[in-house]
From Swiss-Prot:
The keyword Chaperone applies. One of its GO terms (cellular component) is cytoplasm. InterPro entries: PRC_barrel-like_sf, PRC_RimM, RimM, RimM_N, RimM_N_sf, Transl_B-barrel_sf. The PRC barrel domain binds ribosomal protein uS19. This is Ribosome maturation factor RimM. GO terms for molecular function: ribosome binding. Belongs to the RimM family. It comes from the Bacteria. Its main location: cytoplasm. The keyword Lipoprotein does not apply. Binds ribosomal protein uS19. GO terms for biological process: ribosomal small subunit biogenesis; rRNA processing.
Length: 178
C-alpha cells in the first residue's frame, strides 16, 4: 500500500518502562482513533495493532512488542492510517473536513476560479489553505500561489467535498496583494 493512500497520524518516541510502552506524539485532531485493536502502518511498512493506549500519559503499546527491547525497534517510526480507517474512526463536526478531502478542491470567488488547493498549513492561530493560482490569473501577472485562512464566514463560504469545490469571499484581495 502506498503512503499516498495513507494519512500520517503520529510518531513513536522512546520506550517508557519495561513492558513495551512507547511515547506517542499525535499529529492528528482525532486522538480517539488510537484505541485497542486498531492497526496502523509504519513508514517501514510494519503493521502495528494497538494493545493499549493511555491518553493521559500519551503512551501506546502494540501487539507482539510487549518487551522493551522489541519496542525500542519502533522508536522514531511514523504511524499511518488508511483513508477509509480515518473516515470510520474520526467523527467530524459541522464545517470540519479531512485535509485529504480538501486537497485538489477547486476554489471559486463569485464563480471566478482562483485556483486549486495544494496543501493545508497549520499555524498556531489558524489553518491555511495553500492555493495554486489558476493559470488564467497567473497570465495576468498574479502570484502563482497564495494562502487563504481556513475561517468560515470570513473567508470560506461553502465546502462541497463531493464536487471538489470551495466557495470563498475576500480571497481575491489576498491573491492580488500576495
Amino acid at each position: 500500500m502506498s503512503m499516498n493512500s495513507n494519512v500520517y497520524v503520529a510518531k513513536l518516541g522512546k520506550t517508557v518502562g519495561l513492558q513495551g510502552h512507547l511515547r506517542l506524539f499525535i499529529d492528528s485532531d482525532f486522538p480517539e482513533q488510537f484505541k485497542k485493536g486498531v492497526t496502523f502502518t509504519t513508514n517501514r511498512n510494519l503493521q502495528l495493532k494497538v494493545l493499549e493506549y493511555n491518553s493521559s500519559r500519551e503512551l501506546v503499546k502494540f501487539e507482539n512488542y510487549e518487551d522493551v527491547e522489541l519496542a525500542k525497534k519502533l522508536t522514531n517510526q511514523e504511524l499511518y492510517a488508511t483513508i477509509e480507517q480515518t473516515k470510520e474512526n474520526c467523527k467530524l463536526a459541522k464545517n470540519e473536513f479531512f485535509w485529504f478531502d480538501l486537497i485538489s478542491c477547486e476554489v471559486f470567488e463569485n464563480n471566478l476560479k482562483l485556483g486549486t488547493v495544494k496543501e493545508i498549513h497549520r499555524y498556531p492561530l489558524n489553518d491555511y489553505l495553500e492555493i495554486i493560482t489558476d493559470s488564467e490569473l497567473v497570465k495576468k501577472a498574479l502570484p502563482k500561489n497564495f494562502l487563504i485562512p481556513h475561517i468560515f464566514d470570513k473567508f470560506i463560504l461553502n465546502i462541497d467535498i463531493e464536487n471538489k469545490r470551495i466557495d470563498v469571499i475576500n480571497s481575491f484581495d489576498i491573491l492580488e496583494n500576495s
